[in-house]
């Protein structure tokens, strides 16, 4: 999961639910519109809070693995190391419905910040093989979109760790 740096409480909730659903990675991304959010979740102390929430969610859900939580990254870092076998999705209301997408593991899902991706960011993601997919016509909060997208991908691929990168 490539989640936007956003409101602290929403990020913690998102981390918890993505862990319950079996995400293997949960990477906070500083998108252009992430800069305006306050108080936002970022930094090493916040990352420790995320990991603690994830450990609790792992126990509650009887999960098998704890997601990796790397340091906050920029769009340049997101695009720097593409994996050739990775299915890359970006949530965008103009995309085709995610449920119609042909998926193959591993899958990485980019979630936009409050206010959405800027056109330049979306263009760069598309150029980097991120396929635009939609969760429908409604504009969702980032944490709702992350959980909905991950649940659909997990259901489509099955529940093993090798089938959902997150």
Annotate the PLM regions.
Residues 82-122, 130-133:
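Active-site/ligand-binding-proximal alpha/beta "capping" segment
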Residues 119-166:
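Structured adenosyl-cofactor binding patch, chiefly the S-adenosyl-L-methionine
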Residues 3-4, 114, 138, 142:
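Glycine- and other small-residue-rich loops at beta-strand/loop junctions that grip anionic moieties
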Residues 10-11, 38, 99, 117, ...:
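Secondary-structure boundary/capping motif
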Residues 1-89:
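RNA substrate-binding interface of SAM-dependent RNA methyltransferases
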Residues 6, 33-35, 95, 114, ...:
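Short, glycine/serine-rich, charged loops/turns that create anion-binding
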Residues 73-79, 96-98, 139-140:
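A short acidic, often aromatic-flanked loop/helix-cap motif at beta-alpha or helix-coil junctions
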């Amino acid at each position: 999961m490539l989640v936007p740096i956003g409101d602290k409480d929403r990020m913690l909730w998102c981390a918890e639910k993505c862990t319950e659903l079996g995400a293997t990675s949960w990477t906070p991304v500083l998108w252009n519109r992430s800069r305006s959010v306050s108080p936002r979740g970022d930094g090493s102390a916040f990352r420790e809070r995320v990991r603690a929430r994830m450990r609790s969610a792992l126990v509650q859900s009887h999960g098998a693995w704890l997601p990796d939580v790397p340091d906050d990254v920029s769009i340049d870092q997101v695009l720097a190391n593409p994996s050739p076998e990775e299915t890359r999705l970006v949530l965008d209301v103009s995309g085709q419905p995610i449920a119609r997408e042909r998926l193959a593991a591993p899958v990485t899902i980019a979630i936009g910040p409050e206010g959405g991706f800027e056109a330049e960011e979306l263009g760069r993601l598309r150029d980097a093989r991120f396929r635009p997919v939609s969760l429908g016509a409604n504009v969702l909060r980032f944490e709702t979109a992350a959980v909905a997208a991950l649940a659909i991908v997990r259901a489509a691929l099955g529940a093993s760790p090798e089938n959902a990168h997150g």
